Amino acid sequence: MINLTDSAVNAIKSAISSSERRAGGLRVMIEAGGCNGFKYKMGIADEPKPDDTVIDCDGLKVFVDSKSREHLAGTTIDFVLAPESSGFTFHNPNAATNCSCGKSFG
């Protein structure tokens, strides 16, 4: 389904531990928008919704809704530290096109 690199898991666990809200895991989803039709969204979530798939990545729970599941199948999420720009990257084998920003696909 979805894979997270060690770097991504560590960055997310760090964000969750410094968050003031209760966190049951990470929600990963897509929504219409961006340059190429879809954009990625991630956020801390309290708990999974009834139709979510729950994936365990090294102790981190990842929640994926049924609408996003097919589009995200096989995606690897990484966290890259770079002097100019640090952040999450998505390597999605289902994307026919990708925006240069890396946050949108079609």
From Swiss-Prot:
Q: Which domain of life is it from?
A: Bacteria
What does UniProt give as GO cellular component? Answer: cytoplasm; cytosol
An annotated GO BP: iron-sulfur cluster assembly
Q: What does the record give under GO molecular function? A: 2 iron, 2 sulfur cluster binding
Q: Which family does it belong to?
A: Belongs to the HesB/IscA family.
Name of the molecule in the record: Uncharacterized protein blr1755
Q: Which organism is it from?
A: Bradyrhizobium diazoefficiens (strain JCM 10833 / BCRC 13528 / IAM 13628 / NBRC 14792 / USDA 110)
